[in-house]
Curated annotation (Swiss-Prot):
Region Disordered: start-end pairs: 1-49
Superkingdom field: Eukaryota
UniProt KW keywords: Apoptosis, Cell membrane, Glycoprotein, Membrane, Postsynaptic cell membrane, Synapse, Transmembrane, Transmembrane helix
Protein name per Swiss-Prot or TrEMBL: Protein lifeguard 2
Glycosylation sites: 191
Tissue: Expressed at high levels on dendrites and to a lesser extent on the soma and axons of neurons in various regions of brain.
Recorded name of the encoding gene: Faim2
Family: Belongs to the BI1 family. LFG subfamily.
Subunit record text: Interacts with FAS/TNFRSF6 and BAX.
Function: Antiapoptotic protein which protects cells uniquely from Fas-induced apoptosis. Regulates Fas-mediated apoptosis in neurons by interfering with caspase-8 activation. Plays a role in cerebellar development by affecting cerebellar size, internal granular layer (IGL) thickness, and Purkinje cell (PC) development.
Length: 316
């Protein structure tokens, strides 16, 4: 009876008469009863059987591919921790940023090393007083060579001093100064035009090799065996020249040695450059910025010295 009153009350005026005139007859819609209170719902009392139909299965808020059934085995124990999804979605981008920062750090250190070496070479080349002094005192050359060798072994073989600040920068500074002295003394025996010419050739070659190493798809880091064989060939060729030099100077043999040395260290420059990139077979850790700068610096210095032996003219 109550439902009939509610049904009549909810109709618009004149609707009932129009339906009777047309001979239509409709059943009044059933109005659901009020929902149970919280106490009744939790205690199970006051509910009549069949009063409320069973609701449909809850639909997950995420799509089916993103939904994980807690009762199923996902293959990972304990599931993903909080923030793990964000780590995977940004890992490659963060790794690329770290690699770019590493490359900038290496080339910043390398630029400082090359500027210091260039200043020492210019001092030993243009200043006659300094040039005469270093040539008259070869003991400083051998002392610098000993310091260079000791610091190079320390930085190349000991990861502790190489990775810990400030010892890594202190050792690298000593290494750079000793190598700059050796390069400057070698340059003092050649005329100014030869030194400037070799500096320009070295700059062009190193810049071209660096750009090529970054752009090419060829992986130089996978050719370390070939580079080792070439390095051993260069070593034994230099040993042979050292044995023959006191007896007789062979110009063509010395020229072949200089060409071989410049070619080998040009390949090593490409190899060490690609070690910085991180998308090759072998790559340096971002912690090894000192080691990366050390290798490329040595490659450039050796290329310059071999060009100096090949194109340089001795002072009169």
């Amino acid at each position: 009876m109550t439902q009939g009153k509610l049904s009549v009350a909810n109709k618009a005026p004149g609707t009932e008469g129009q339906q009777q005139a047309n001979g239509e007859k409709k059943d009044a819609p059933a109005v659901p009863s009020a929902p149970p209170s919280y106490e009744e719902a939790t205690s199970g009392e006051g509910l009549k059987a069949g009063a409320f139909p069973q609701g449909p299965t809850a639909v997950p808020l995420h799509p089916s591919w993103a939904y994980v059934d807690p009762s199923s085995s996902s293959g990972y124990e304990g599931g993903f921790p909080a923030g793990h999804h964000e780590l995977f979605s940004t890992f490659s981008w963060d790794d690329q940023k770290v690699r770019q920062l590493f490359i900038r750090k290496v080339y910043t250190i390398l630029l400082v090393q090359l500027l210091v070496t260039l200043a020492v070479v210019a001092l030993f080349t243009f200043c006659d007083v300094v040039k005469d002094y270093v040539q008259a005192n070869p003991g400083w050359y051998w002392a610098s060579y000993a310091v260079f060798f000791a610091t190079y072994l320390t930085l190349a073989c000991c990861s502790g001093p190489r990775r810990h600040f400030p010892w890594n920068l202190i050792l690298l500074t000593i290494f750079t100064l000793s190598m700059a002295y050796l390069t400057g003394m070698l340059s003092s025996y050649y005329n100014t035009t030869s030194v400037l010419l070799c500096l320009g050739i070295t700059a062009l070659v190193c810049l071209s090799v660096t750009i090529f190493s970054f752009q090419t798809k060829f992986d130089f880091t996978s050719c370390h065996g070939v580079l080792f064989v070439l390095l051993m060939t260069l070593f034994f060729s230099g040993l042979l020249l050292a044995i023959l030099l006191p007896f007789q100077y062979v110009p063509w043999l010395h020229a072949v040695y200089a060409v071989l040395g410049a070619g080998v260290f040009t390949l090593f420059l490409a190899f060490d450059t690609q070690l910085l990139m991180g998308n090759r077979r072998h790559s340096l850790s971002p912690e090894e910025y000192i080691f990366g700068a050390l290798n490329i610096y040595l490659d450039i210095i050796y290329i310059f010295t071999f060009f100096l032996q090949l194109f340089g003219t001795n002072r009169e």
